Structure formats: structure tokens, C-alpha cells
Amino acid sequence: MFLEVADLKDGLWVWKVVFLQVCIEASGWGAEVRDSCGCGDSSSHQTDDPATALALHVACHSFKGQLVQQTLLLGTRPRVWVNNIPQEGPSLPLRQWLLPQCPSLNRSGSAMGTGWGLSGLSPTALSRDGYETETPFSPEGAFPGGGPAEEEGVPRPRAPPEPPDPGAPRPPPDPGPLPLPGSQEKPTFVVQVSTEQLLMSTGGCDKEPPRGQGVDTRGDRTQEGGEKPREQREGPRPEQGPDIPGQQEESPQQEPSSERGDSVGEREARSPGHEGEGGGEWPGISGERRESPGEWGADVPRGRGEGAGEWGSDVPKDRGEGGREWGPEAAQEHGEAARDWTSESPRTLGEDARDWGSSSRDAAGSSPCALRGSLAPERLGDGPWPAWPSPQEREPGPRDRVESPREWGGTESPRGWEAGPREWGPSPGGRGDGPRRRPRKRRGRKGRMGRQLETTATSASATGGPAEEAGASAPEGQAGGGPRGRARGPRQQARRRHGPQRRRGPPQAGEEGPGDATLVLGLGTTSGEQRADQSQTLPALAGAPTAHAHAVPGPGPAAATLGGRGRRGSWRGGRRGGGAGASGGGRGGRGRGRGGRRGSGLSGTREDAGSPSARRGEQRRRGHGPPAAGAAQVSTRGRRARGQRTGEEAQDGLLPRGRDRLPLRPGDSNQRVERPGHPRGGHGAINAPSAPDASPPHHPRRWVSQQRQRLWRQFRVGGGFPPPPPTRPPPVLLPLLRLTCAGDPGASRPGSRRPARRPRGELTPQRPSPFAPQEEGLRAESCVDDGAIAPDTDTASGEVPEAGPSLSSTMCQMGRPRPSPKSPR
């Protein structure tokens, strides 16, 4: 029971006695508590659950100790764990252990003397309560060496309890409310205690609840799920080891309990896959264990069913039943005594299962169960804890190989169970050799950028025909030839990506590249993978100088264009709209092929000058970076080429400017490319940094203006406001509008003149006569009702002509539905 007491009545301290966990093994307590409680408020204690009663009582007494003394310490030596230290009733003065747990100086200043030891607990001096300091329990008083509390009023200074040792294993997490004790003998209120406590408290199994339950087959345990395991947890601790009769005896194989890894840490470390339980406990997984029928027996059902059959008959029952549960024992139980579970993965076990199978224990099956109880809840299959992949799932490795869970995946899979053997990482060989590998992210300068250095002339060839024709001069090609400014080194060039994005290189001369320029360019990719990987490389690679993103691709290490962001490498609009245009603004982002949609006043001629439509020769970029090869549009000749391979033109903006283009910034383009910093020192283009703080502003106000300018530039480049929605001729909109106003989209006649028909059963004022003829619904009526209704139409339809302008559609909404005959349905 956790008793949490916040301000005790006169307590200076708000302390949580979270630790007064009272585990009562005797049953008569409810009554005793009620009787011994003098608080008159016995109704509050009127619960038959002794632990609860005790807690209530204690709370109601502000821990005056009467109760605890009379009750806790009464005849049955209840176990009380305080602060997780199991103590047995009167054998130890409560004060000695309660006190340290609850630091509280009582207000009166007396240390509450040697009151039977709750002195630490009760803010009220015990001596005032009539429990004088001489109590049978400890003449020493709460403070060893202290004698009775010092003169009243002078509390002996007490050090606050030391915080729990961080290294010490924590008590296993509380598994939550115990399920009703199913087959268990009456639940002893067991609280989980950490292994240490158990070690301390139970040297042996003497205090254990009869382990008879140990034999419970798993079924029992599972239904009790939390409780029994808890009990068991409390109970046969592995320390108890074989000596727990019911428990170990059966399994000769059982390892020495010590190995049992019972210390929580050890137990926890064990990979959950501990041996058997894999499948059952982690029901989700069909493991290899399960898979190799031979091993587990062909039939091995997946479920946690009882008995060996579960694992297949050949599996000895022990595995079937309990072993499967991951009792720590079970885990160890296969012969190796000290297998270190942490290092061993279930797979290993998986293989061993056969060995385990041999354990005799299986006959009883019980011990695994019992064990299971003692396992930390993580292992319990039933608990709320997520199942770990079952060991079964792993293919058995050689038995002794120690492997870490990392390896559980296919045996060779470096990445763990998620990936099949070859799933990631470069595969040594050609195309078909494995499941599609994700392109390996290159990290660090050796990855994408460093390569530029190695490629020299090759890059010119690499950048390949179109690139060259696009004016990449070779030197620059080497610097920025690849669209990301990484020259495609010879190796990279060949690197094939089977994914949608084929290569980031400029399209080879004859080759038709992947459809979307963004992919080709490595601009945005759906996964963001490339971009991520570029940005990973950035800082590392670019080195400080280019760290603010305006680095232009250049051969030097500095040349790492950040992530190859294009020359003037700012995210400008995300590489001009790179992936979705940064904030939608990229030039590409706004789909401006041909500038057609730039529907803003800004369109002006800027558009021809700089928009992608102003292609190639006339590239008067007016100082704005390379034309966008945007995600949405790399417009090659002003046509949106979305998804279409837009040949080199798509990229030529990204290719180094050479021959016919004016350099981006005054100065020799190649030279500038090589020295990526801002030409005049200072920051790069204002919008250069991809992250706002990439180039820290030097002046607070400057930052604002930079931002403003950056936003504005994005806006301009991205084409200003999105074009207003096309205006539709009103006749088209009105009927729609009108229907919705009428509130009944199904109304047959859109006219606003009559409110839409309401569903049949609804009460609405109806003019009983004359019903409009049925065909009225079909009658075509002009959608736009100019107000006056031609009476002849109405009379034709049998409707009484109404004078006055018909309500406009809005009026329908405004609640003045005009009464009108409803045609009968």
C-alpha cells in the first residue's frame, strides 16, 4: 500500500510517506485496526482490507504511532516494507527504520524522542502522545546514541535521509492494480520490493508465500497477471534459489539462484527475450523459434497456451509452461549456469531452447512460472509492458555466441531486427542484390563534399554533356558541378539509387533522369532524406567558414556548399522553392512556370528577367540566385515541368554560370566560387542562412531588417501572393450558395424563393394548401432570382404567387424562411 500523506496535521513537513508500504500477511488485521484506532472515526477505517484500514488509520493519526505500534507490531509479525526495506514486525523497532525514512523535525522541536520509533514520522511529539520515550522498542531513541530525545525543544540535528543510491536497482515499476487474486491463496498484500530488499529480508524462502503457486502453470499466473507475479516477485526471489522448495526443486537445471540475475539490474538487463517466453510472452512475434518447428516442435502454437504443447510437444514442458514466461529462472534455466543474459540475446536462447527443453523442470513447469513471478514486470507478458520481440523471432545463432540485442535482427543485419539482412548499407554488389537499400547517408566531409575535391576533370565529364553545355565551366563544375554543388565524383556518379530518386547528378547526356527535377537535383525529396543528409554534412563539412549557409559550392573544404545549397546557397526559397519552397516561398514553390501564376502585382518584368522562364541566355538574374529548380516547377521553357524530366535546362540554373551568363555576383564566377565567403566579408545574402541564427545578426535592429528583407525576398521570389482564386461567374456560384443557404443540399429546387424542404418528419409551419404539384421540384427556375417572382410561374406550379422580392439566399440563413407550400414527398 502506498500511503501518501501530504501535510500531516500539524506537520511542518509535507512529506510523502510513499514508502510506508505495508504488506500484511496476516488476515485479522482489519478488525484490529478498527479497534485499536482511537480516533473515533472508525468509520473511516471501516474497510476490510487491512492494508487500507491501516493506511487510513495511520493517516488519520498523523502517524501518532498508536496504531502502528498496536497494530503493526501486534502479534502477527507483519512484514512492513518501509522505503522498500522489508522489516518484520516487532522484531525490529519500527522506529529504527521508520525514522530514517521520514525526515521530519517535529514542530515542537522535540525529536519525539524514542516514541516507539515513529518519531521521525510523526510531526507531533510522541512523548506528548503518551508514548514516553521509554518504550520497549528502543531506549536509544530515534537517534542511536541519543538516549531519549534530548531536552524537549532541542531537536538533535538529523541529516536528511540520504537519497537512494542512484546505482542501486530500483524496485520494479509498480505493475498497477493487482488483478483479483484468481487461483492464488489469499493475496498477501505484497508490495514489490527491490531485489535488495528481498535479499535483505529473505535470506531464504522461509517467509515466502507457499510457492505452491509456483507451480501454477502459467495460466494461473497469467490470469493473475500482475498479482501473482508480484507476489512471486516478492516471493521466491531467485536468491531463494533452489531452496525455494516448490520452486527450484523441480528444475535441477536451474542455475544457482545467485546467477539468477536476481538483482534487479541483472534481471532487467537480461534481454527480454529471455529464453522461452518469446513467443508467448511477446505474443506478437512469431519467432524463429516458432518458426523452426523442429526446434519447438512443429506445432508450436503461438499463444501462450499452457503446457509444452505450446511450444510444440518436443519442447519440454518447462519451456512450454513456465519457462516461456520469462522467469528469470527460466531464463537461466537452461544449463548454463551463469549465462549472462545481458549479453545473450534471445536468439541465442532460441537456439538453446532445445537445451532448455531438457531441463527437468519442465515437468513441473511450475518453477518457470514461479519465476516468472519474480521477474520484473517487463518480462511479464501480460502486463502493460510492450512486448519485446520474442527471442523466437530471432534466428538461432550459434549457441554461445554472445550477441547483443542489436544483432537480433537477421543474423547479419547490422541494424537490428528492423532490417533484413541487406536492408541498409551499401550492398556490395550490383542491382538486384538485396532488398532495396536506402541510399546510404553520407556523413561528414568525406561524404559528399570532400568528394568534390577528388573529382577534378572527371567532374567535368561527370557533370556530363548537358551540364557542360549548360555552361558549367569545368573548374566550376568541379566545384559545384553537381546540382548540390557536390561534383559527382566518379564514385558518386555511379552510385545508383534504386529509389525514386535516382542520382543526384546532372542528367547524363543521353540519359533520361528521374522525372522530377527535384529528385534529380536532390532538391527536396519526399523523405527529406537528401536534404537531411546534406544538412548533416553541412557544418561538419563546411567547416566554419561556410557554416553560414551562403557558402557557394566550391572546391575547397570551404566549398561545401552547405548541403550544396546552390551558389549563393541560401535557402533562398528553399533552393528556390527547393522542397516546397522554403516556407512556400521558393521560387519554385509557387509554381511559377512561365510566371503564369505569379498573380501578384509583382509579376512585372522581373518575371521575365529572373523567372525560370527567362531561361538560359537571357538569364539576367538581376542578382538573384540561380533560377529556381523548384519542386513544383522546374520550368524549362516556361512550361511547368513537373515530374517531367526537365533536361539540363532545369538544372542549368543550378549549374555554374559560365560563358553566357552573367556571374551571380560581380567578380569572376569561378574564382568566387572558390572562396565561398561573402565577397565583402560580413554575412552572405541576407536570406542566406537556412536557420535564422545561422549568421548571427550583429545588431538587434539589423536582425529585424534582415528578417524582413529575407521574408520579402522570399515573397518576391516566390511570386508574391498566391493568385486569387479564379473568379467564377456568379451564376455558377449562386446555385451552390443558395443550396447551402437553404440548408438542405438535397433540395430539388435551388431557388431561394422557398426554403428547402425539410425532412418529412420535421415540424415546420406548412401552408396546408395548395400543395405544389409534385413536378414542382423539377421545374426549372432561373438560378438567379432577381427578386420579383413572376407570378405566372408560381401559379403555373400551383403556388400562390407571393408578392414582394424573394428573399435573397442570405435571408434564408437569416431565419426568415418564407412560408411556402411544401410539396408532399
Curated annotation (Swiss-Prot):
Subcellular location: Nucleus
Low complexity bias locations: 247-256, 455-477, 537-562, 734-750
UniProt keyword Nucleus, yes or no: yes
Known function: Might have DNA-binding ability.
Domain of life (superkingdom): Eukaryota
Taxonomic lineage of the native organism: Eukaryota, Metazoa, Chordata, Craniata, Vertebrata
Species annotation: Rattus norvegicus (Rat)
Positions with biased composition (Gly residues): 576-588
Regions of compositional bias (Basic and acidic residues) in chain numbering: 217-237, 257-277, 315-342, 392-406
Extent of Basic residues compositional bias: 437-449, 485-505, 565-575
Molecular function GO labels: DNA binding; protein kinase activity
Name of the protein: 5E5 antigen
